């Protein structure tokens, strides 16, 4: 089905241009991830590869953090800024609430505010991680650790992050899929060969001959688990809950009945990306504080509580996924606006009163769908982390669930967008033919 869809898409010039443009932007991003920040010894980070928060940061940055490239921050500051702006729209700041109700004009203002906040966050974060990683690597990361060097590296990383955000926006506007998700998707896909190589070395090369058979069985089970996750994730991401709707006689030209489709997981994979970004930040700060040379007991306690290698850390990560799923579900679908749009189009849900009754019905339904979505996202993200601790797996495998979620969800979103465009074009072509 995928190859047939791609084949049909490439026959149409406009669609082909969009696909090639998306691939071009991703290639630009991948080239940027290979350019190390000047004045930095990226090899010093190899000794820190076992740190779980570094792997989490690399995941959110599209795998650009491990070699401290000019795109090392990736879209992480932008993700945090997006969360801040969306929270401010929830009756916290009147101006942001007002912008949220202004349609396209308000959306542009909110996007501009998000960029400004992400710019400030990127600069603070860039200096923080540079100083922190320099301390963790015993001052081997930065050759001349003075304020001029830190300001220069901060400027380079901030500029790189803004370029990545711009690249993501270009994909959203002129290509296929969500730009932020596509950037992270590209980084994960690019790291798959390294991931496979790591598993091969861990279970077939660096093992005694008497354990080779058990390694083969284990890897076979791992492959089966991956296939099951792929199937389960694909099924849930495509599943829909159909709300029956009917039209009044006033709605001219409308069908007598239809349905309103809602995804079983309306929030998609964004809550996992948000949770990963938020989880990595305090873990990084605590790790940097512990490397400062001060023996602070509260730092050690906080590290043990928040690390994703501990039960409390795993629980916190799961809780963040659940909270962001509920939060983003209602960001994606506003029950008040949905009820208003149905009423304006002369549609109603059988057995539900239009207006306030429809709004309450939608809110209740969305809470149920968000519950299902959060449990699904939490399960897929957490199980590999728990399996890592139980079976002594590598961090690569531990983040495999999150990586698979992002890959599959982003792939499905891109395919749906492509499929919808082809269907729309075919319908438009048919209508043009019949009217001649």
From Swiss-Prot:
Signal peptide: none annotated. It is found in: Cell membrane. The chain crosses the membrane at residues 19-39, 68-88, 116-136, 151-171, 179-199, 216-236, 269-289, 313-333, 372-392, 395-415. InterPro entries: SecY (IPR026593), SecY/SEC61-alpha (IPR002208), SecY_CS (IPR030659), SecY_dom_sf (IPR023201). Keywords: Cell membrane, Membrane, Protein transport, Translocation, Transmembrane, Transmembrane helix, Transport. GO terms for biological process: intracellular protein transmembrane transport; protein targeting; protein transport by the Sec complex. Its main location: membrane. It is a multi-pass membrane protein. Pfam families: SecY (PF00344). Gene3D superfamilies: SecY subunit domain (1.10.3370.10). GO terms for cellular component: plasma membrane. Component of the Sec protein translocase complex. Heterotrimer consisting of SecY, SecE and SecG subunits. The heterotrimers can form oligomers, although 1 heterotrimer is thought to be able to translocate proteins. Interacts with the ribosome. Interacts with SecDF, and other proteins may be involved. Interacts with SecA. Belongs to the SecY/SEC61-alpha family. The central subunit of the protein translocation channel SecYEG. Consists of two halves formed by TMs 1-5 and 6-10. These two domains form a lateral gate at the front which open onto the bilayer between TMs 2 and 7, and are clamped together by SecE at the back. The channel is closed by both a pore ring composed of hydrophobic SecY resides and a short helix (helix 2A) on the extracellular side of the membrane which forms a plug. The plug probably moves laterally to allow the channel to open. The ring and the pore may move independently. This is Protein translocase subunit SecY. The lineage of its organism: Bacteria, Bacillati, Bacillota, Bacilli, Lactobacillales.
């Amino acid at each position: 089905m995928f190859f047939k869809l791609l084949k049909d898409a490439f026959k149409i010039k406009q669609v082909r241009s969009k696909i090639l443009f998306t691939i071009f932007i991703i290639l630009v991003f991948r080239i940027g991830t290979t350019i190390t920040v000047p004045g930095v010894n990226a090899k010093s980070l190899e000794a820190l590869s076992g740190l779980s928060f570094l792997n989490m940061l690399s995941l959110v940055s599209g795998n650009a953090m491990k070699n401290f490239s000019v795109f090392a921050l990736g879209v992480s500051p932008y993700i945090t800024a997006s969360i801040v702006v969306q929270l401010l729209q929830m009756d916290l700041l009147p101006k942001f609430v007002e912008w949220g109700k202004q349609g396209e004009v308000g959306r542009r203002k909110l996007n501009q505010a998000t960029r400004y906040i992400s710019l400030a966050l990127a600069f603070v974060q860039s200096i923080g991680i540079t100083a922190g990683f320099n301390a963790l690597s015993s001052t081997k990361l930065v050759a001349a650790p003075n304020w001029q060097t830190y300001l220069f590296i901060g400027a380079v990383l901030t500029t790189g992050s803004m370029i990545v955000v711009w690249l993501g926006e270009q994909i959203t506007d002129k290509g296929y899929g969500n730009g932020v998700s596509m950037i992270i998707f590209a980084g994960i896909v690019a790291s798959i060969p390294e991931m496979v190589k790591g598993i091969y070395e861990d279970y077939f090369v660096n093992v005694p001959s008497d354990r080779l058979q058990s390694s083969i069985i284990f890897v076979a089970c791992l492959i089966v688990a991956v296939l099951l996750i792929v199937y389960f994730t694909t099924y849930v991401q495509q599943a829909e809950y159909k709300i029956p709707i009917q039209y009044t006689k006033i709605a001219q030209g409308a069908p007598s009945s239809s349905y309103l489709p809602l995804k079983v997981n309306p929030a998609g994979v964004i809550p996992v990306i948000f949770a990963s970004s938020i989880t990595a930040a305090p873990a990084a700060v605590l790790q940097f504080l512990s490397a400062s040379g001060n023996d602070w007991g509260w730092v050690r306690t906080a590290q043990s509580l928040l690390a994703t290698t501990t039960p409390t850390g795993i629980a916190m990560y799961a809780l963040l996924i659940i909270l962001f799923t509920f939060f983003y579900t209602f960001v994606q679908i506003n029950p008040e606006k949905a009820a208003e749009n149905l009423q304006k189009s002369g549609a109603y849900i059988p057995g539900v009163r239009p207006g306030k009754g429809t709004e309450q019905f939608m809110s209740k339904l969305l809470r149920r769908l968000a519950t299902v979505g959060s449990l699904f996202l939490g399960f897929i993200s957490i199980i590999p982390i728990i399996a890592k601790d139980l079976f002594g797996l590598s961090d690569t495998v531990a983040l495999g669930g999150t990586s698979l979620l992002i890959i599959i969800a982003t792939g499905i979103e891109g395919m749906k967008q492509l499929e919808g465009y082809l269907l729309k074009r075919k319908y438009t072509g048919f209508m043009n033919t019949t009217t001649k």
